[in-house]
Amino acid sequence: MASCVVRDWQGKEAGKATLDLKVAKETTAVDLMHRAVLRQQAHARQGTASTLTRSEVRGGGRKPYKQKGTGRARQGSIRTPLKPGGGIIFGPKPRTYNLAMNRKERRLALRTALMARIDDVTVVQDFGASLEAPKTREITDALGRLGVAAGSKVLIVLTNPSDVVRRSVRNLEKVKLISADQLNVFDLLHANALVLGEEALATIQEVYGDD
């Protein structure tokens, strides 16, 4: 079980919150999270790269020149891989890069990653509730009040992000906003700082704390 300080929108301490999630053993935790990240990155690949073999390249049916008597090496087609414009030898073809990982392992890796970053977590009451209109400056000022260093990669996790908050955040290159039920290992490990809404903490405990 881990304890976190809850802060209000002004950055002042407003209480305590706890998070109790089952994590992997220390001896297997790094390998488990590594496999989860590899799987996530592999699933993000389109796998649509494709080249033509010599049999698929248009043309090349006619023999370029006669077999003998020219003094040159014999050629049977202008689409041989040895010539510019010819086919590609062992080139890429459409494929899937998906890696298998069972659900129990995926959830364990996610919980382990979150608990490993618990010291970088800031819990905020009613994140962005006072915003009446989208304003990026309000978000950057709030992050500063919460102790997030300027230029840091920040992951904001909310239960149901409002449209105002989404539009306020989307212009910040190093700030990413996701829903509490859409957590993933890569984002948790990639960010320098994690900002969680107080209600998101309860959602995380509910969604990921059953195992």
Curated annotation (Swiss-Prot):
Which stretches of sequence are listed as region Disordered? 41-86
A single Gene Ontology CC term: ribosome
Recorded hits in Pfam families, A to Z, give: Ribosomal_L4
User: Is the keyword Ribonucleoprotein in the record?
Assistant: yes
Organism, scientific name:
Synechococcus sp. (strain CC9605)
Member of which family?
A: Belongs to the universal ribosomal protein uL4 family.
GN (gene name): rplD
NCBIfam families membership:
rplD_bact
Keywords on record? Ribonucleoprotein, Ribosomal protein, RNA-binding, rRNA-binding
Q: Where is the composition biased (Basic residues)?
A: 60-71
Oligomeric state and partners? Part of the 50S ribosomal subunit.
GO BP, sorted A to Z? translation
GO MF, one example: structural constituent of ribosome
- InterPro entries tied to this protein: Ribosomal_uL4, Ribosomal_uL4-like, Ribosomal_uL4_dom_sf
Describe its function.
One of the primary rRNA binding proteins, this protein initially binds near the 5'-end of the 23S rRNA. It is important during the early stages of 50S assembly. It makes multiple contacts with different domains of the 23S rRNA in the assembled 50S subunit and ribosome. Forms part of the polypeptide exit tunnel.
The entry's protein name is Large ribosomal subunit protein uL4
